[in-house]
Swiss-Prot record:
Residues 13-32, 478-552, 566-586 are annotated as: Disordered. The keyword GTP-binding does not apply. Residues 19-277 form the uDENN domain. It comes from Fusarium odoratissimum (strain NRRL 54006). This is Elicitor of plant defense protein 1. Residues 566-575 have a biased composition (Basic and acidic residues). SMART domains: dDENN, DENN, uDENN. GO terms for molecular function: metal ion binding. Residues 435-799 form the dDENN domain. It is found in: Secreted; Host cell. Belongs to the EPD1 elicitor family. Pfam families: dDENN, DENN, uDENN. Keywords: Metal-binding, Secreted, Virulence, Zinc, Zinc-finger. Acts as an elicitor that triggers cell death and defense responses in the host plants.
Length: 931
């Protein structure tokens, strides 16, 4: 193995570059609601006293609370419960092994006693830091503000009684707009004067006090492939804790299912379940009527291709910036992601690492870097880290770094990246424009998607990981797209393979479970209000005004007061919130801008807004400005280069809304008049008689009022499998002849366990002249050296090695249609002598396309047989609703049950006397269960 010059120049040991966390230094003059508190671990499972679990699960890591709350904890003042958020994080153990975590954060109201104490502290601060005139003005504004809010609640209560579209309705809406403007003005005036909790407003303030603290529930494990599964499972188990905040959940019943205490779900996942064993088994877990399926990729698939999300990164950055970022990662730069949304950092870091396949990022990898570890940015080694925009003191390195602003689609770097060879870069861009046309041809705007901003966008249990809720596993397409010629790379998917997005997992679960009735639309319990303001200033675009007037009175009548506020006035509502770190936006009562969530009706390809939350039609980017600390604007900001200069044959189709067509998040919704039988995929209600919208791509239906809630991209507008194929094809062209230079090892190398010795100089000399400089750069990277080392140490038929070799063979076969797509020359020789061309592997089942390499097209191991984990059920002490809606700080052991056996898992071989098979118990099943 060739030593990495870049790695030897920089330190690479995790513990040598990651400093201990800085302590919290609290200013004694700081206002109580600006003060940050250090998070602590309240409880864990298995408990700390279960020392016998350490050998199997490993030592519980330090600093987990700091990664769950990377910016520590603040008390938030808000009328409504702040929005639930989620994020993933990666920790490195003492032995340099990785631990992966997913956490979901919900907000709990401070009880009256604690809230009173906080108010006393606020009053003391006001007495010592504000003049008497300021306090009087603040008190006066507070009284007037409370009066206007009460007036607003009275006006909102009248809305259901007045027909939509009538003159009286128009006058009432104008009056509501005026009151909201007054509230906005007074709130802005009050913010610099009064720093404290405003008094509770009856009918508008949820909770006992209007003061909220965050609480995190999370999972730790060693398998990154399970992170998306853990996220959806966590969303499911916290749904009852929102006490109706997640809408359109069918009510509990014996036929549908009943919620169980949190403790039983924890035992179900951590003790009764096991990790999926390759592609032969998928593990089914249940939460009420939901069924979730954990599965792994097959040996002949790209690792992470079924679990790692790419859309969030591609929605945030232009294709030009994506390729530039890929070039920086290939050169092992110090890459820093910046975003206002913690989960966006997690999604972007994992997506970038996944695109490097077959190379593996081997240096520091911290998708969410806590604020008290910011000094790690000075680490003298390559890294991929993510930092939140709201951190107080962000000090970037002096040089040699790349700052990627995910919210503004900019890359700020101290040097140009080492560019890919010209032809390889041009080809990669061409394929990406076909694989990811969501911005060029489907009008998707730039910025984080809704599911990267909060746990339940638009108060719905939607999911970007729809395959996790379907027992039928999507087909593998890697063989197809690495074998496909460039001209056929954009061919449409067969209609039966286009799976619609899942906007309500609970409703779909009811259909999948064989119920004959259509999904119910009733709310679960008391409806929690919708809020556009969260601790990280989350706000979605307003609800669109539909091109054709549609009656929404039925929806209004069914809604509660708080739902009316959100349903009629969009997401940009004004709420009373803590004035610290929360952006205020004017309310949009009657939006008249022709744009929707995830869509801008631009006629210029280059005029893509960089602010996904406030994009408008027209030229240029909105919400300008730079990073905010005086950094120079990026020279790699989103490209204005027309796609046709790279792929001349590609047809650019700017989109626009018409009277009968609406574009939302890549969906092309066409109006179907007089349709009263179709069911809206978003709210699960029937069409309202005059018609309904239908997407031409994925065939989903939507009411006009629901269009703005279509938060998931249309599968016709974004193709993650083709994107992965485009990147791996690029690397296959760069490493096309590498195996030719794996020769016999020396005696010393053999003694070290090497099966081959790589001739690096010979490999570089064999490359075309325009690739020499790039190959010389790769020679210095740890990623490439570990790629070669793996192939020196492992046989060619090892599945992890063979996947990429088969992709290279597919590249050879693309240019020569008669070429056998076997692994090497040996397979050709064997075929000429009548031997199997599959090298000892079974031929693919039903593979009729000779262009697809035999091994990549082999689906004989693509079984994913379901092993069902027993569903948590049974009676429990206490009042049902009180138990299932609580947000416990500690697990109640009395609510747990003894673990049960698993049905349908592969039989464990006997270990004792011949023929004696031990009964399976949870402690025997699987590898490294989550904590």
């Amino acid at each position: 193995m060739i030593a990495s010059i870049r790695t030897t120049r920089r330190l690479s040991n995790y513990n040598s570059v990651i400093p201990p966390p800085e302590p919290l230094n609290t200013d004694p003059d700081m206002h109580p609601l600006k003060r940050r508190f250090e998070p602590v671990l309240l409880d864990r499972y298995p408990p700390q006293e279960a020392t016998d679990e350490i050998t199997r699960r490993g030592k519980f890591p330090d600093y987990v609370p700091m990664f769950a709350f990377p910016n520590d904890i603040q008390i938030v003042s808000s009328d409504d419960r702040p929005r639930s958020t989620w994020h993933g994080f990666t920790m490195t153990s003492d032995d340099n092994s990785k631990l992966y975590g997913i956490t979901i954060i919900i907000w709990t109201a401070l009880n009256a006693e604690v809230a009173e104490e906080v108010e006393k502290k606020c009053e003391q601060w006001r007495q010592s830091h504000m003049s008497e005139e300021e306090r009087e003005l603040a008190a006066s504004l507070g009284v007037r503000l409370a009066g206007e809010r009460t007036h607003l609640s009275q006006l909102l209560a009248k809305l259901p009684t007045i027909p939509s579209g009538s003159p009286a309705r128009e006058r009432l809406e104008d009056e509501i707009s005026t009151v909201e403007e007054k509230i906005t003005l007074m709130t802005d005036m009050l913010r610099p004067l009064r720093h404290g909790a405003a008094s509770k407003i009856e009918g508008l303030t949820a909770g006992e006090s209007g003061l909220w603290t965050p609480r995190a529930y999370g999972i730790l494990g060693r398998d990154a492939a399970n992170m998306s599964f853990w996220k959806e499972w966590l969303k499911a188990i916290v749904t009852p804790m929102t006490d109706g905040g997640v809408l359109r959940i069918p009510p509990s019943s014996p036929s549908v299912g009943r919620w169980q205490p949190l403790e039983r779900y924890v035992v179900n996942l951590c003790t009764e379940a096991f990790n999926p064993l390759g592609s032969k088994t998928q593990v089914e877990l249940g939460v009420r009527e939901l069924r979730l399926y954990a599965r792994k990729e097959a040996d002949n698939e790209i690792p992470g291709s079924r679990s790692i999300d790419l859309y969030a990164l591609f929605r945030c950055l232009s294709l030009e910036n994506i390729v530039a970022l890929f070039e920086y990662a290939m050169a092992e730069s110090r890459i820093i992601f910046l975003s206002s949304h913690t989960s966006m950092l997690h999604l972007a870091c994992h997506a970038l690492a996944n695109l490097l396949y077959p190379l593996k990022w081997s240096s520091i990898f911290i998708p969410v870097l806590p604020a008290r570890l910011l000094s790690a940015l000075e680490a003298p080694c390559p890294y991929i880290v993510g930092i939140e925009r709201r951190y107080d003191r962000i000090e970037l390195p002096e040089d040699d770094y790349v700052l990627v602003d995910l919210d503004k689609d900019t890359i700020d770097a101290t040097s140009q990246p080492v560019r890919l060879p010209r032809q390889a870069r041009r080809k990669l861009m061409s394929l990406l424009q076909v694989a990811a046309p969501h911005k060029l041809r489907y009008g998707v705007t730039t910025g984080p998607p809704p599911y990267a901003m909060e746990s339940f966008p638009y108060d719905a249990f939607s999911t970007e990981n729809a395959a996790l809720f379907r027992s039928a596993t999507p087909k593998s397409t890697l063989g197809k797209w690495v074998s496909q010629s460039s001209s056929g790379f954009g061919e449409p998917d067969p209609p039966n393979e286009v799976l619609p997005p899942l906007f309500n997992a609970f409703a779909s679960a009811k259909v999948d479970n064989g119920k004959s009735d259509r999904p119910s639309t009733s709310k679960s319990g008391k409806t929690s209000p919708q809020s556009s303001v969260s601790p990280v200033s989350i706000n979605f675009p307003p609800m669109p005004s539909t091109p054709v007037s549609r009656s929404d009175s039925g929806f209004a009548l069914a809604a509660t007061l708080r739902e009316k506020r959100s349903g009629h006035f969009g997401e940009e509502k004004m709420r009373r919130s803590s004035s610290f770190g929360i952006d205020k936006h004017p309310p949009y009562h009657k939006p008249n801008l022709p744009f929707l969530n995830g869509h801008q009706a631009n006629l210029s390809i280059s005029a893509i807004s960089v602010d996904s939350q406030n994009s408008v039609v027209g030229g240029g980017s909105s919400g300008g400005g730079g990073y905010g600390n005086g950094y120079a604007p990026s020279t790699y900001a989103q490209s204005t280069l027309a796609a046709s200069t790279i792929m001349p044959s590609m047809q650019i189709q700017p989109v626009r809304n018409t009277e009968t067509t609406v574009w939302v998040e890549g969906h092309c919704f066409n109006w179907i008049p007089k349709d009263n039988t179709s069911i809206c995929n978003i709210c699960n209600d029937h069409a309202e008689g005059d018609g309904i919208y239908k997407c031409t791509g994925c065939k989903i239906f939507s009411h006009g009022r629901c269009l703005g809630h279509a938060s998931l991209v249309c599968p016709e507008a974004f193709h993650p499998d083709r994107i992965r194929a485009a990147f791996v094809r690029c690397l296959a062209s760069l490493l096309y002849t590498y195996r030719k230079y794996l020769g016999r090892p020396s005696k010393q190398q053999k003694a070290n366990g090497q099966l081959y010795a790589f001739d690096m100089d010979g490999f570089i000399k064999s490359l075309p002249h325009d690739q020499h400089d790039y190959a010389t750069m790769m020679r210095e990277t740890q990623c490439f050296n570990e790629f070669i080392h793996d192939r020196e140490m492992q046989p060619a038929n090892n599945a992890s090695i063979r996947v990429f070799d088969e992709i290279i063979m597919a590249k050879k076969a693309r240019g020569r249609s008669g070429l056998s797509t076997g692994l090497s020359r040996l397979s050709t020789i064997r075929a000429s002598h009548g031997a199997s061309t599959y090298g000892g592997y079974a031929p693919p089942r039903g593979s009729s396309n000779s262009k697809i390499p035999a091994w990549l097209g082999d689906t004989s191991d693509h079984i994913w047989r379901t092993a069902s984990v027993p569903l948590p059920k049974g009676n429990f002490p206490g009042e049902y609703r009180t138990v299932v809606t609580r947000t416990p700080a500690r697990l109640d052991r009395s609510l747990m049950r003894e673990p049960r056996s698993i049905q349908g898992m592969p039989r464990v071989e006997g270990r004792g006397a011949r023929g004696l098979i031990r009964k399976q118990v949870p402690s025997m099943l699987g590898t490294t269960p989550p904590t």
